[in-house]
Amino acid sequence: MNASGTFFFVVGPSGAGKDALMDGARAALDDNYVFARRVITRPEGAVGEAHEAVSEAEFARRQRSGEFLVTWDAHDLRYGLPCSLMSELERGRHVVANGSRAVIAELAQRLPRFVVVLVTAPQDVLARRIAARGRESGEQIARRVARTGAALPPEVRCLTVLNDSTLEVGRARFVEALRHGTRVASDGAPASRTNLMAKLRGEPLDQAAYVAVLQDAMAGRYTEAELTEFLVAATRSLDDQEVVALARARTVFTPRIKWDEPIVVDKHSIGGVPGSRITLIVVPIVAAYGLAMPKTSSRAITSAAGTADAMETVARVDLAHDDVRRCVAQARACIAWNGRLNHSVVDDVMNAITRPLRLDSRRWAVASILSKKYTAGATHVIVDLPYGPQTKLATRADAEALGAMFEHVGKGLGLHVRALVTDGSRPIGRGIGPALEVRDVRQVLANDPCAPADLREKALRFAGEIIAFDARVGSPAEGLRIATALLSEGKAKAAFDRIAATQGARPEPVAPGAHTCVVSATMQGRVAAIDGLRISGVARAAGAPRELGAGVDLLCTIGAKVESGQPLYRIHAGSDAALAAAAALARAGGECSEAVRIDPD
């Protein structure tokens, strides 16, 4: 059988949106692409894809007669792809079929031009989509999105499509993947293979070599096994100048945004500290001063809140490029979700490998982060590097070394980068979860005496450093003085309100969840530590960040004396069921039960 078309086998986790992307591709592609109609032992007209419904007996008969190319079982149903699809391949048409990872190896052995299309999305996006169906509880959803699919056979070609933005963006990425995939089997050995092999031997690559490897990787010309070897080698031998070369290579794939501004500011934090929502304070202070700060941020993946989740409690964050320009023109800044703005095809391919393997890819990440700041049009970048026992950087020395790397690579890209090492050993602020963190932010902006002092102090430090990027200011100390005045005089609050209004403010901010319970001390003593990972675990069990009002409100501070029975923190949730799940995790001896450690006096 001489099949000349390409067989695309689409897989991905629940909530990834495979069916929606395939529907869009069906309308966008020409007749040279055939979309398989699966045979399923499910009634005609049932919820789900259009399919050929058959009885169990009829399915078994067809299987015995050899009428299926492949079959599999899932969710108490039987699925099959008809052998007639081989005729389409022989005519040179490309087949697109939605299927199961379990049969990938079998199909790869039978089909000469076989490409897996892996549709994926961050866990928080998957969870929101599954929750919107209304068929599963929060706990069931959490378990579902935490599952990891079986590893793909190493010899199989795989194209990854990140579907974390709008349906329109997702469909465009999916269609582009299919078009790339038609060339995978016919291109032969990638032209950049000599570069890849050099990296496997530990040799440094220059910018041109990285461009060539990345182009072939994005086109699906390397197997997942080959890319894994490449990334493992890169994490072991990537010297300072090579990180600069990699960062420059990445900028080739995205045109740089042009701003008619002498200074365009951006900020990045490597995260890992619960609370610490300083961006929502820093940006309006900087905007009130007059510098342009088009800030784009991520949603949470494993934490209780991301900057975009927090801002979404007060305003729209899914801005397009024109919206960002309008916000900067009218309000000098924005705080937007980066899903529609800073998408990197390179990251789609590489993150699919580095995240499951938990590779120490910090140097690779520096190149990724700063290349995206460059293409976003930033001229000056400040980086927050918290260190502590539960952050990504264990020691101050680790943070200082990474800070030096950020500044070195930034210089290589023509950026002015300032990296600040900060204490990440404890939560900053009292709220953990989108609405609760924004409550703290609004207290700081309003100069409320109850505002968390640590949140205010850290935000002012970063705002002062950014304002000092303006040569007229002269020093970070003077920048801090200016930032403090802008905050104290209410100008930062006015700037925040203006930014929210320009983005599209909610009529009322999302309030903390109304379903609450308190976790109290079981002994007398002093608060010795607040475990950020465990306290975030309780907040996530309560529904954060999917439920914007869910989270934890800290009622104690490290070093404070507490009595037995004294409240330590309050859990907020959007439902009784979510509250019960979080409370059980906090109290029943689970991993989060010692979120606040008390030592006897």
From Swiss-Prot:
InterPro entries: GK/Ca_channel_bsu (IPR008145), Glycosyl_Trfase_fam3 (IPR000312), Nuc_phospho_transferase (IPR035902), P-loop_NTPase (IPR027417), PhnN (IPR012699), PYNP-like_C_sf (IPR036566), PYNP_C (IPR013102), Pyrmidine_PPase_CS (IPR017872)
Origin superkingdom: Bacteria
Broad enzyme group: transferase
Cellular component annotations (GO), alphabetically ordered: cytosol
Enzyme Commission code(s) on record: 2.7.4.23, 2.4.2.4
Keyword annotations from UniProtKB, A to Z: ATP-binding, Glycosyltransferase, Nucleotide-binding, Transferase
Biological-process GO terms, alphabetical: 5-phosphoribose 1-diphosphate biosynthetic process; organic phosphonate metabolic process; pyrimidine nucleobase metabolic process; pyrimidine nucleoside metabolic process
Entry keyword Glycosyltransferase: yes
Pathway this chain belongs to: Metabolic intermediate biosynthesis; 5-phospho-alpha-D-ribose 1-diphosphate biosynthesis; 5-phospho-alpha-D-ribose 1-diphosphate from D-ribose 5-phosphate (route II): step 3/3
Catalysed reactions, as listed in the record: alpha-D-ribose 1,5-bisphosphate + ATP = 5-phospho-alpha-D-ribose 1-diphosphate + ADP; thymidine + phosphate = 2-deoxy-alpha-D-ribose 1-phosphate + thymine
PANTHER family recorded: THYMIDINE PHOSPHORYLASE
Role played: Catalyzes the phosphorylation of ribose 1,5-bisphosphate to 5-phospho-D-ribosyl alpha-1-diphosphate (PRPP).
Family per similarity comment: In the N-terminal section; belongs to the ribose 1,5-bisphosphokinase family.
Protein name: Bifunctional ribose 1,5-bisphosphokinase-thymidine phosphorylase
Lineage: Bacteria, Pseudomonadati, Pseudomonadota, Betaproteobacteria, Burkholderiales
Name of the gene this protein is made from: phnN
